[in-house]
Amino acid sequence: MKKNLTELVSILDRSGSMGGLEQDTIGGFNAMLTRQKEQEGEANVTTILFDHEVQLLHDRFPLHAVAPLTEKDYYVRGCTALLDAIGYGVEKMVNIQRHLPESERAEKVIFVITTDGLENASKRFSYEKIRRMIEREKEQYGWEFLFLGANMDAVKEAARFGISSDRAVRFENDAQGVAVNYHVVSETVSRMREAPCCASIGAEWKEQIEADFQKRHHR
């Protein structure tokens, strides 16, 4: 195991319903990268964009070498192949970690999955298959999965593919909500990278996102 090395996998929704939030998403993602670059320790960045198709944007780029996201990279279209994006990312990282020498395997693997809508376009992966894949990596290797969903019961949806309630949160899909999202995600990823064990980070990580959502909905 290579100490202080993190594999950070971001799975970003760019389906048509994200229209109008392109700049907010780009700005939030770039701010997160900047924050991570300031932190000690190594990290490889994998970024997967999805609509009705899945696109690999960054393929384990060293963190310091990742250029800012631009409008040429992130533009919206199509439907929501959420399961295919998650399945592709997990399958890819499993293959990488299994085939690397033990001394080169990342100490931590963190997935951040962000979507504003429910699955409606996947062809390769089912909920059950994703659940088995995620549960295996969590239980055997301590991988972390954060799920941030808008326009849905995010906790209920995350449970369908094996992500526990303390790692799932519903956010408000507008400029303010997206900004809060990325601020919290950046802070949480930093804490996970620094912590001796990611599991030591409890459900408190998502309190700011929950408070923002509840404030706007008076609940």
Task: For each feature predicted by the language model, list its residue ranges.
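Acidic, low-complexity intrinsically disordered regions
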Residues: 1-219
